[in-house]
């Protein structure tokens, strides 16, 4: 089992962390995310431009007394620590401008392709139904990741993995996804792979 490193990140209060956790708890993706009363934990797979891959997990919890977020990550992620921290905080640290409730953050996302696929899957169905479908996809096609935590063991399929499917309609259809949604995900993956669509944060 790998070790971990911990980083403390100061924020300007107030920070409504419990509300964010409640949002993510209702949408936690099986095998990828775990949310309890005090923390958000998920699998991580980072790949640099040279094709080097780092896999592990990231856990974020709030130290409200110290006005800081406590980020704990697998030591395999140390070479990409700045990217890991940035992406770990992305779902948790987008401040809302011009609102009347101090400390509110707009939930972001960790993996843009993952969240885009989940948005397609979730069209016109309930959050619960969308989570079940997404969970089946990641269980069948997601890369296995060792985290040392039961139930936290896969990453969302990469663009290349989706494109390698002989028939996405058949592959995802077996799991309950309708053809139009499968085709939409396939078209999105193709556009990303061919450089026509950039979902990177800040693009």
Predicted stretch roles:
Residues 1-203:
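HhH-family (HhH-GPD) DNA N-glycosylase catalytic core used in base-excision repair
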